[in-house]
């Protein structure tokens, strides 16, 4: 769940209805989606509203003609002739009671006004009359939304000294009704009055009316974890997919699927993780998420990501890493999260950050803005700490009436190219929720970040005192920026008016349970279609048998190639390597296996021998996205030497077949390696030392084989009895005991590669047609099955000399000098 452990959408029986002011996130499990939902305890008067009206009594019954008698008769005018005849048979006469002596009740028994679980006779003061707000002129519901941006900011970002002078300390304030600098007094007071009306109303009664009154209500969470995912889908579309498909200032896409870096994003204060589930559903293994939220009941629920691969998301909880508390208001947690993100993104930062924090303010709903001020500040501070220049930020806010809140918005306005305050249709209109959307972080914002950090230190210092930070930007500076000031007032008053109408509408729907929004189903379909979201139900992912899943993924093609074993390289077949440019080579460290992932820790391996028997990967802690098929080795990695040496089993990827459902077998070998490197980077979790690592093998060109021998050393291992053994050190300073060299043909017959001495360029040559071309011919690409079945393996066994310190040499076996001299002979630039 979110940081808001008890947001307004939670089905808490005793919660007051005014909690429309808190987040409307996690109610879908307790609510029905029918448009005419009504309580089982509806009053009789509500039921009567569905009956046909009764006709007046006949003229013969009005023969006395007295005014008093007419008034009495009018009491029964609502009943038809049949009803009156039945009463007449029982001896009923107007003005008299039933019974032998007319001793029965003379007045009509009034219909019950009891609703829900109210106490008998309880009359809710706010629901005895109208609110005198015309809500019926609201605009027609539509899936089309418009974005209004702040004017582009012209002021320069102040330096640290000037910013420090902006902070104003004063007496802590716990009232909102006098905050009229950024909203008209009449609108603010009317809004507070409309909220207060619901204070004594039972929560369930309010929720039923809200469900019927909101035309967008049945969109809910679709097939995602919760409604937050659909809010993100909604806003991603409205803002032209600037989050899931970011572009530079020239409109060039920054993160393509086949090439380019991962889409790095962050999600803070956002358990259980609906925002992230949407992003990962949209981009899958081409994205990597980092999250920080409160541990415990409000934590991320990654196991409930049914629509997207949660294995691509790494939760981090600030100081202490996975053992931290995730409290974003602690300065040390923000600093730790910043360092972790920068380390994980090669110092570049995130493409965008999402923040959706909130917490329960039960009983103090009107003060939500004031009570949430530090949370809002820390989310803004985190954005400036982890978002890269040009990156984006999206954060939930509530009312923005106080100078403190507006000052924070002004600081964002200075730091980003464009800023908007936006309320998506997936956010219920009766609450004060809206989102600040920031596009294009400007360079040189460190001074503002440090200023926000200082403000947070002050707020922590004042937490238990009557002092507080009341302004972060002087009011005269805000008012002096006319464009910003006018936009702020217009935005506040616009959303205030929308909220007032929505509250009045709910008030009317509480009073009349027959009212409902007839277009809910149509609007839902329109929105899902516009946002590109399939209209399907949320279902638990099905479990699969590994053997059946394997056949499903490979589609029965080239099955024999899986059983092929590598050809041993020797002096006889060394001639196969005469077209040197056709080959790549990889250092082996164990038996080649096929690895199949069915999601999270459901991982199986097969040695490639017939018949196929998939075995669960035991004694491994690793999580991989479902529908993934790789060619791998299980290698024991070593770090250090002697008694201090540490060992860990790792998965080393040789090649990729299917990546989270994406079949890459027909891609060029180099392309497959690039894609699986991207995939491995997305699933790796450096913050989890308890998990076994997964790495992609380093690939060398055959003509550059000598680079491999530079990485070979003789090292002492614990199991070697003090004798040095041949070791290969990888890119991450971990080494392993090499078993030999895989040599992989990446050019498909009849094509080969050669080097043109005249043009000093490599070109492709067709041995059958004699065609030559510098461009890569599609038919020259060797798919996986060709690479796999035509591979050679040069075993570095006893008697094979590949390191200068090795003294035992078998002249019948290929040594380093033999292979290197052969390569030099056939490759001359």
UniProtKB/Swiss-Prot annotation:
Cellular component terms (Gene Ontology): cytoplasm; nucleus
Domain RrmJ-type SAM-dependent 2'-O-MTase residues, every copy: 223-442
Primary localisation category: nucleus
Domain G-patch intervals: 79-125
Entry keyword set: Methyltransferase, mRNA capping, mRNA processing, Nucleus, S-adenosyl-L-methionine, Transferase
SMART domains in alphabetical order: G_patch (SM00443), WW (SM00456)
Physiological role: S-adenosyl-L-methionine-dependent methyltransferase that mediates mRNA cap1 2'-O-ribose methylation to the 5'-cap structure of mRNAs. Methylates the ribose of the first nucleotide of a m(7)GpppG-capped mRNA and small nuclear RNA (snRNA) to produce m(7)GpppRm (cap1). Displays a preference for cap0 transcripts. Cap1 modification is linked to higher levels of translation. May be involved in the interferon response pathway.
Name of the featured protein: Cap-specific mRNA (nucleoside-2'-O-)-methyltransferase 1
Gene symbol of the encoding locus: cmtr1
């Amino acid at each position: 769940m979110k940081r808001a452990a008890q947001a307004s959408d939670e089905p808490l029986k005793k919660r007051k209805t005014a909690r429309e002011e808190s987040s409307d996130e996690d109610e879908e499990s307790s609510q029905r989606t029918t448009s005419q939902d009504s309580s089982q305890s509806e009053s009789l008067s509500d039921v009567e509203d569905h009956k046909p009206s009764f006709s007046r009594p006949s003229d013969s019954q009005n023969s006395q003609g007295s005014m008093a008698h007419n008034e009495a008769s009018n009491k029964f005018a609502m009943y038809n002739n049949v009803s009156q005849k039945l009463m007449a048979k029982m001896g009923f006469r107007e003005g008299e009671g039933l019974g032998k002596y007319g001793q029965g009740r003379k007045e009509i028994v009034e219909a019950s006004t009891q609703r829900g679980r109210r106490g008998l006779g309880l009359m809710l003061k706010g629901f005895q009359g109208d609110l005198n707000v015309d809500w019926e002129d609201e605009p027609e519901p539509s899936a089309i939304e418009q974005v209004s941006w702040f004017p582009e900011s012209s002021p320069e970002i102040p330096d640290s000294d000037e910013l420090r002078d902006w902070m104003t300390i004063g007496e802590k304030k716990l009232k909102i009704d006098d905050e009229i600098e950024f909203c008209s007094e009449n609108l603010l007071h009317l809004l507070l009055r409309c909220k207060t009306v619901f204070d004594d109303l039972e929560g369930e009664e309010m929720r039923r009316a809200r469900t019927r009154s909101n035309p967008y209500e049945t969109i809910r969470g679709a097939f995602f974890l919760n409604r937050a995912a659909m809010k993100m889908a909604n806003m991603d579309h409205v803002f032209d997919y600037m989050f899931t498909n970011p572009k530079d200032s020239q409109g060039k896409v920054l993160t393509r699927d086949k090439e380019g870096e991962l889409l790095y994003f962050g999600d803070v204060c956002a358990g259980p993780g609906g925002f992230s589930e949407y992003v990962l559903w949209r981009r899958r293994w081409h994205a990597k998420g980092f999250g920080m939220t409160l541990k415990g009941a409000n934590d991320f629920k990654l196991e409930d990501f049914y629509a997207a691969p949660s294995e691509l998301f790494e939760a981090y909880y600030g100081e202490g890493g996975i053992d931290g508390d995730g409290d974003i208001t602690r300065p040390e947690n923000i600093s730790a999260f910043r360092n972790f993100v920068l380390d994980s993104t090669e110092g570049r930062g995130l493409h965008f950050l999402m923040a959706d924090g909130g917490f329960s303010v039960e009983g103090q709903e009107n003060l939500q803005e004031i009570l949430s001020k530090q949370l809002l500040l820390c989310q803004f501070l985190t954005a400036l700490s982890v978002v890269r220049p040009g990156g984006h930020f999206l954060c939930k806010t509530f009312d923005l009436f106080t100078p403190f809140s507006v000052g924070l918005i002004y600081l964002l306005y200075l730091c980003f190219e464009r800023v908007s305050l936006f309320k998506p249709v997936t956010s219920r209109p009766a609450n004060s929720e809206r989102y600040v959307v920031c596009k294009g972080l400007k360079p040189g914002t460190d001074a503002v970040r440090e200023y926000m950090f200082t403000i947070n230190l002050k707020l922590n210092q004042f937490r238990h005192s009557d002092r507080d930070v009341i302004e972060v930007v002087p009011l005269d500076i805000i008012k002096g920026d006319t464009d910003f000031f006018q936009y702020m007032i217009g935005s506040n008053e616009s959303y205030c008016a929308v909220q007032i109408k929505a509250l009045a509408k709910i008030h009317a729907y509480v009073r009349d349970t027959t009212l409902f929004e007839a277009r809910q189903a149509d609007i839902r379909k329109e929105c899902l279609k516009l946002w590109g979201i399939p209209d399907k139900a949320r279902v638990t992912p099905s479990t699969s048998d590994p053997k059946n899943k394997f056949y499903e993924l490979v589609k029965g093609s080239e099955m024999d190639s899986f059983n092929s074993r590598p050809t041993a390289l020797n002096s006889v077949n060394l001639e196969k390597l005469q077209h040197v440019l056709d080959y790549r080579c990889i250092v082996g460290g164990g038996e080649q296996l096929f690895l199949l992932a069915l999601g999270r820790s459901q991982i199986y391996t097969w040695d490639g021998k017939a018949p196929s028997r998939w075995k669960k990967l035991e004694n491994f802690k690793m999580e991989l996205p479902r529908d993934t098929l790789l060619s791998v080795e299980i290698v024991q990695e070593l770090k250090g030497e002697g008694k201090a040496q540490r060992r860990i089993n790792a998965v080393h990827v040789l090649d990729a077949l299917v990546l989270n459902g994406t079949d890459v077998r027909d891609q060029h070998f180099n392309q497959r390696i690039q894609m699986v490197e991207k995939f491995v980077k997305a699933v790796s979790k450096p913050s989890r030392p308890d998990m076994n690592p997964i790495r992609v093998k380093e690939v060398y060109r055959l003509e550059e084989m000598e680079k491999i021998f530079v990485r070979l050393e003789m090292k002492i291992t614990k199991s070697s009895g003090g004798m040095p053994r041949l070791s290969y050190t990888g890119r991450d300073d971990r080494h392993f005991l090499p078993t030999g060299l895989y040599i992989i043909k990446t050019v498909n017959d009849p094509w080969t590669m050669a080097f043109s001495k005249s043009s000093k360029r490599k070109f492709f040559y067709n041995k059958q047609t004699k065609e030559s071309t510098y461009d890569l011919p599609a038919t020259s690409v060797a798919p996986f099955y060709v690479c796999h079945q035509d591979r050679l393996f040069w075993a570095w066994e006893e008697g094979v000399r590949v390191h200068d310190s090795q003294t035992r040499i078998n002249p019948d076996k290929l040594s380093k000098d033999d292979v290197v001299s052969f390569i030099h002979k056939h490759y001359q630039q």
